[in-house]
Amino acid sequence: KDEIIDAEADAKKVVSKKDTQDAGEVNKGKEKDKDVNAGSKGSGVPRLQKITKKMNLPMVKGNMVLDLDHLIEYKPDQTKLFNTRATDAQFATWYEGVKAEYELSDDQMGVIMNPFMVWCIENGTSPDINGVWVMMDGDEQVEYPLKPMVENAKPTLRQIMHHFSDAAEAYIEMRCASGPYMPRYGLLRNLRDKNLARYAFDFYEVNAKTSDRAREAVAQMKAAALSNVTNKLFGLDGNVATISEDTERHTARDVNQNMHTLLGMGAPQ
């Protein structure tokens, strides 16, 4: 009999505990989802669309040529659209071409790309460079031909190297943290502010994050580097032949090869 009473008491405790939990969950739900009084008054804050059909948008035969829903969501990486940077396909073609001519594997190319980037930081990416580029293996200089690097670079080597801009900037920062360092490009431009060393290479890619002072320094260095450069559209035409015969007769008494006499005067002694 006592056992029956205890069982009933335990059952009541379990039921009461469950009711308490259910009540607590209901209260939590009420706290999360607050009821709005239908009699309350208020003004909702209007949300304006950034691009609306009321704008003066391009039209063809009364139909808008833009997809506004797609345009609102279209936010590509800005640097991917720059025409001063080689496309991903052009960069991949350059990489595969260099790898094939050097006869290297992907792992070996990873080792080659590091010192080549550093070499370009120091020496630039001018299309006129030729000969060899150098990497250091301890204290030993190892030479590699520049021809595969330059000839496979389309459109230009500088546009290819724009892909290395962020990595080069981080490398210069690392070098500056361990001691005084200024790339050769900055030394030639006589850049005096060591804080701008991270921008002192000719394939630095200016973007929206670049500070005003850094942009000015990059522009001034580029202007100084190109100040004495003259580009000619046409060079000397080598396919030139004489199409007329010179039948002019000259004697030893002529003034010069283009003049017979000076109207009776002799040649000056």
From Swiss-Prot:
InterPro entries: Poty_coat (IPR001592). Genome polyprotein of potyviruses undergoes post-translational proteolytic processing by the main proteinase NIa-pro resulting in the production of at least ten individual proteins. The P1 proteinase and the HC-pro cleave only their respective C-termini autocatalytically. 6K1 is essential for proper proteolytic separation of P3 from CI. Residues 1-45 are annotated as: Disordered. Residues 9-36 have a biased composition (Basic and acidic residues). It comes from the Viruses. The keyword Ribonucleoprotein does not apply. Coiled coil: none annotated. GO terms for cellular component: viral capsid. Keywords: Capsid protein, Virion. Belongs to the potyviridae genome polyprotein family. This is Genome polyprotein. The lineage of its organism: Viruses, Riboviria, Orthornavirae, Pisuviricota, Stelpaviricetes.
